[in-house]
Amino acid sequence: MKKWLVVAMLFPVLAVAQQNHKQYEPPSAPGAGQKLLAKFAGNWNLTQTFFPRTGKPIVTTGTCHQYMVQDGKFLESDFTFYRPGGKKTTGTGISGFDPKTNRFTTVWFDSRQTTMSIRQSDGTFDGKTIVLYSTALDPDDPGRKTVARAHLEDNGHVLIYRHSLIGPDGKERLIFEMRLTKK
């Protein structure tokens, strides 16, 4: 009796183990989001304007090299920022789009801090603008609510990225804007 019970319990495990990787996790092809991300690829000069709550905006410059990776499924973005006083910082972003969920997800890390930030869209995509919301990594500390929007202008020669803080009342306050111009 015990033997049959063990066999009955192991059978589903063995059946799942017989699945190959493609059956378990089928590959997905690039979708509409990857088409837009591919338009972001290239070498860019950038101007970043930070809007503090009080005082004058702070303007810095930089460069960005963006390129598609993993057979055209993800956009990698390598930024160099030239801060006031001659200090240079760097940052890297990885952006992807899941055609099944119609969602963009981005991960960002930089030389200024040891944390990573993750943003994700809500599943609506008009084919032109990427809208991302902050995603909390710590369920006990959701952090600030932010929204970031990116779109192309001037026939793809200008990329505008705006990042806003969402207040408790739902109103947005622009924190910074990056204007990237294709080299």
Question: Residue locations for each model-derived region?
Answer:
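Positively charged n-region of N-terminal signal peptides that target proteins for export
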Residues: 1-4
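Hydrophobic h-region of N-terminal signal peptides that target proteins for export
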Residues: 9-17
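Hydrophobic small-molecule pocket/channel-lining residues, especially in calycin-type beta-barrels
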Residues: 18-183
